[in-house]
Curated annotation (Swiss-Prot):
The gene is rpsF. Gene3D superfamilies: 3.30.70.60. It comes from Dictyoglomus turgidum (strain DSM 6724 / Z-1310). This is Small ribosomal subunit protein bS6. GO terms for biological process: translation. Pfam families: Ribosomal_S6 (PF01250).
């Protein structure tokens, strides 16, 4: 398995509870697809440098996780189905040893 980091930008329209439910759902997707979440860093609501989908604010969450490379396309497909997830970026941190 490889080590990845995902940074998520989530709609500011959500309540704190709905925001928590959304990022916990992303964690659940990682685990259901054979991955392991190692660290979750919730940055909270931040002002954006430029509007994204007409929003000037958004919630940020950064997660580090181990994940099988073969499951990455399915994970990205599931992320795209989440309407309140405005943007995400997945970065490979370390290759397999």
């Amino acid at each position: 398995m490889r080590k990845y980091e995902i940074m998520c930008l989530i709609s500011p329209e959500l309540s704190e509870e709905d925001f928590k439910t959304l990022y916990e759902g992303i964690q659940q997707d990682i685990q259901n697809l054979g991955g392991e979440v190692q660290n979750v860093d919730v940055w909270g609501k931040r002002t954006l440098a430029y509007p994204v989908k007409k929003f000037t604010e958004g919630y940020y969450v950064v997660m580090n996780f181990l994940f099988p490379q073969t499951q990455l396309p399915e994970f990205e497909r599931r992320l795209k189905l989440r309407e309140k997830l405005l943007r995400y970026m997945i970065t490979l941190l370390e290759k397999e040893e």
